[in-house]
């Protein structure tokens, strides 16, 4: 039952009506209505449809002041964790910030707009439908110096207050951090991790390393939130079996160091204790670890047995926003009910259904504030009964009490350094050393830490390598804080040339920038643009979208030469972030943006860059396919063309440009690397009526569309005779003519002879009409077929001869007469009887 759960968690509920108090400033007007609110330790702040903020004292609910603004109807209000800043927004994409709520001076709302960073190379947030985005979620960063804003179009932007606090501000600039495909529902933060929940997915972001990961693979569609749960030792500190066992074993011991008991707030939280909870349809929650791996699914649809007497047990409640309560529980609500759930135990702790029409619910400490659509306000207080828990005492080993590092950091450091890690029992884990260092620096032994390092340096016949304190602490700030405690005797800081970490750790690669920590004024204009390019790229991976319009907004401000320079810088950034195939990814970004018409207008160097990128991109991605093709023994050109080609319109335009200027060397350089482009050159041969080249190219390329075009435009009976000669040479001599040097080359692998392969296919499969296109099923992404028939069917006697009759190039009797000269060379059964009927009737199907 619910009350049993309340007693189990040590909770008791109190309710206070606040409607009269909050309505006091509005008693003389009916026009002004409150639209949203937030609470902090000191204040209750309401946003109104007039654009003003109404500030109340939280304890007494006394009205304090009005903060006016030009925002119009306010839709979002969020107070920072220190209670000194306020973030507000409206439905038109405007954002306001109040910097010093506790100051004595008159308060001012500083305004900016979503997409305000566009002028500096930022990424705008006007949606694909053309509507203006608006803020749907706020999240204050660490130390309340950063404000993350999620909007209705899927953009998460960062506003860095540290850039302008204490200055005269003319404007504020938002920097895009993450681009997703739809509405942001909720944003939460834990250290450098940012958790973003949209209508369809949850994304975990490391803002320092710029890494992104989607949590789970199953999509959803609706307003579903997500949050971090960080265990709070001040609440629900129930003893484990191991705790009780250790406590019992130490009862009556004279070695109990009760004076060393640390406060709960000083207890460290292990990373593996932090959990992520993501809402799912059907009153479910996904539980994931700190790395974004889904561990289990919690079902709450049938958990509340107390609801059977009051409402339908099977009713599904959508968990829209997840709000943390007392460090472990989660509060969710809809427009009629409030639920307090324990996500770890999959249990409903509290259910409230008599609070009216709910608009917003906010939490601070043990107080739950409920604001109704009818302008009512109430406070629900959850009193926590603190339970005395037996302290986990140190165990005895061989009759002697061990010294845990949380209680005796000096011993751990002295033992580790002066024994140089050679004795048994030495604690060598990274967490142990960090905890010990922190314990020493915080405690009264900080002034003696110098002697420990001196003792460590003097041990052993050889001087051991020096401990690098800054690397153990993993940040310059932590190192500086520690150095302030140490003595200033410079003689003790002489270091050996060989310095290493005592604790091996994985340091992230050096980066050009960090999205969450870097200020815009520290970057050049090009670096800002590169930053935004990389951001769009990372967001496109998470969202599975192209974002071509985003790239266009950035690239349109630069000429081609500048874009090439930006791409080189972007490649460096990707390499530093351990992106695989960074060169190819940069090429893809540019080619997705490039309009082929520009190839005719740009300078020579830029055109050469595009040509080289086209060759590199296709050779890398089509490596296996190109390796399957035979090459000329003399000149090294491919004897046949490949089927796939990435960005064929770019390659085709390059061939057209060079051919129009009779720069044939560049054309043949392209086809030597990417033989697919012989399609385009063959078209020029047909167009120019180059009989000496056209027939040979048509045969080697094997494109039905080219054969049908040539049959209509230039083929005579003599041309069909030449084509039959090429067919017999290929079939009987296992040879193909090189399109570059005209040398007859024998195929090293008979299995790659297109006519032999087609003959085997015909023997293994039923005969199909070669003009029937419905049997073709091409599932290979990137394949470009230049005709209406599968390319393999091209190399068959039936297809070639039927094309001659169907295109009405020659009459049937002339074709039969031509074939009489080849009857002893053509395999038996290679030509179907339907072809002979066509010739006799001189009609086509």
Curated annotation (Swiss-Prot):
One of its GO terms (cellular component) is cytoplasm. InterPro entries: Beta-prop_HPS5-like, HPS5, TPR_HPS5_insects, WD40/YVTN_repeat-like_dom_sf. The keyword NAD does not apply. The keyword Acyltransferase does not apply. One of its GO terms (molecular function) is pigment binding. Residues 239-268 are annotated as: Disordered. Pfam families: Beta-prop_HPS5, TPR_HPS5_insect. Keywords: Pigment, Sensory transduction, Vision. GO terms for biological process: eye pigment biosynthetic process; protein targeting to lysosome; visual perception. Has a role in the biogenesis of eye pigment granules. Eye pigment granules are specialized forms of late endosomes or lysosomes. Biogenesis of pigment granules in the eye requires molecular components required for protein delivery to lysosomes. Belongs to the HPS5 family. This is BLOC-2 complex member HPS5 homolog.
């Amino acid at each position: 039952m619910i009350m049993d759960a309340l007693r189990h968690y040590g909770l008791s509920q109190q309710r206070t009506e606040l409607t009269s108090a909050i309505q006091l400033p509005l008693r003389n007007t009916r026009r002004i209505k409150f639209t949203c609110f937030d609470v902090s330790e000191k204040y209750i702040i309401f946003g109104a449809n007039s654009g003003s903020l109404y500030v109340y004292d939280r304890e007494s609910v006394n009205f304090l002041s009005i903060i006016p603004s030009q925002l119009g109807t306010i839709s979002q209000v969020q107070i920072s964790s220190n209670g000194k800043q306020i973030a507000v927004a409206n439905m038109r994409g405007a954002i306001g910030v109040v910097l010093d709520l506790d100051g004595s001076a008159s308060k001012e709302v500083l305004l900016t707009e979503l997409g305000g960073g566009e002028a500096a190379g930022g990424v705008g947030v006007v949606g694909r439908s053309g509507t203006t985005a608006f803020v749907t979620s706020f999240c204050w960063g660490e130390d309340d110096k950063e404000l993350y804003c999620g909007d209705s179009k899927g953009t998460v932007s960062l506003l860095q207050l540290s850039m302008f606090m204490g200055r005269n501000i003319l404007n504020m600039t938002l920097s895009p951090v993450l681009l997703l495909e739809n509405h942001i529902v909720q944003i939460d933060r834990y250290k450098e991790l940012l958790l973003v929940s949209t209508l369809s997915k949850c994304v975990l972001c490391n803002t320092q390393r710029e890494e992104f990961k989607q949590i789970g693979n199953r999509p959803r569609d609706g307003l579903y939130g997500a949050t971090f749960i960080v265990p709070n030792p001040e609440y629900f500190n129930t003893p484990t079996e191991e705790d009780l066992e250790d406590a019992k074993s130490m009862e009556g011991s004279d070695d109990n160091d009760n004076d060393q008991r640390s406060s709960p707030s000083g207890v460290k939280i292990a990373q593996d204790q932090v959990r992520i909870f993501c809402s799912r349809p059907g009153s479910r929650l996904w539980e994931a670890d700190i790395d974004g791996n889904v561990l289990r699914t919690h079902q709450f649809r049938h958990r509340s047995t107390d609801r059977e007497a009051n409402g339908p047990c099977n009713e599904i409640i959508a968990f829209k926003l997840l709000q943390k309560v007392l460090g472990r529980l989660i509060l969710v609500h809809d427009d009629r009910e409030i639920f307090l759930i324990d996500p770890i135990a999959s249990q409903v702790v509290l259910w409230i259904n008599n609070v009216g029409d709910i608009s917003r619910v906010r939490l601070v400490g043990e107080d739950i504030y409920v604001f109704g659509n009818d302008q009512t306000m109430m406070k629900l207080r959850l009193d926590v009964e603190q339970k005395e828990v037996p302290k986990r005492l140190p165990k005895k080993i061989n009759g002697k009490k061990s010294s845990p590092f949380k209680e005796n950091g000096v011993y751990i450091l002295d033992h580790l350094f002066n024994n140089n890690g050679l004795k048994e029992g030495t604690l060598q884990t990274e967490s142990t050393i960090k905890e010990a260092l922190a314990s020493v620096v915080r405690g009264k032994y900080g002034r003696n830490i110098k002697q420990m390092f001196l003792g460590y340096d003097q041990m052993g016949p050889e001087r051991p390598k020096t401990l690098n304190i800054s690397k153990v602490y993993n940040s310059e700030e932590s190192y500086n804080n520690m150095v302030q405690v140490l003595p200033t005797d410079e003689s003790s800081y002489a270091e050996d040339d060989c310095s290493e970490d005592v604790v091996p750790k994985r340091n992230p690669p050096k980066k050009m920038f960090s999205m969450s920590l870097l200020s815009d004024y520290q970057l050049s204009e090009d670096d800002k643009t590169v930053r935004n390019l990389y951001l769009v790229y990372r967001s496109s991976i998470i969202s599975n979208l192209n974002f071509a319009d985003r790239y266009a907004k950035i690239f349109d401000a630069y000429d081609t030469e500048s874009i090439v320079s930006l791409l080189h810088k972007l490649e460096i950034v990707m390499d530093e972030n351990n992106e695989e195939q960074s060169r190819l990814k940069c090429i893809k970004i540019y080619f997705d943006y490039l309009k082929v018409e520009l190839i005719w207008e740009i300078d020579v160097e830029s055109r050469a860059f595009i040509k080289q990128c086209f060759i590199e991109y296709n050779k890398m991605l089509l490596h296996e396919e190109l390796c399957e093709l035979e090459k000329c023994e003399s000149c090294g050109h491919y004897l046949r063309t490949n089927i796939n080609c990435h960005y064929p319109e770019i390659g085709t335009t390059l061939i057209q440009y060079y051919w129009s200027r009779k720069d044939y060397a560049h054309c043949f350089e392209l086809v030597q690397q990417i033989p697919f482009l012989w399609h385009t050159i063959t078209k020029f041969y047909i167009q120019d009526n180059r009989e000496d080249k056209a027939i040979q190219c048509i045969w080697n390329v094997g494109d039905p569309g080219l054969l049908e075009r040539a049959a209509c435009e230039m083929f005579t009976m003599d041309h069909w005779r030449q084509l039959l000669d090429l067919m017999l040479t290929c079939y009987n001599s296992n040879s193909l003519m090189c399109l570059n040097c005209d040398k007859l080359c024998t195929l090293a692998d008979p299995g790659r002879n297109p006519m032999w392969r087609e003959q085997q296919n015909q023997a293994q499969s039923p005969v199909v009409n070669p003009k029937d296109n419905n049997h073709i099923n091409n599932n290979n992404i990137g394949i470009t077929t230049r005709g209406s028939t599968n390319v393999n069917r091209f190399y068959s006697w039936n297809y070639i001869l039927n094309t001659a009759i169907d295109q009405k190039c020659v009459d049937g009797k002339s074709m039969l007469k031509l074939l009489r000269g080849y009857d002893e060379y053509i395999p038996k059964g290679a030509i179907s009887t339907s072809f002979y009927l066509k010739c006799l009737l001189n009609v086509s199907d």
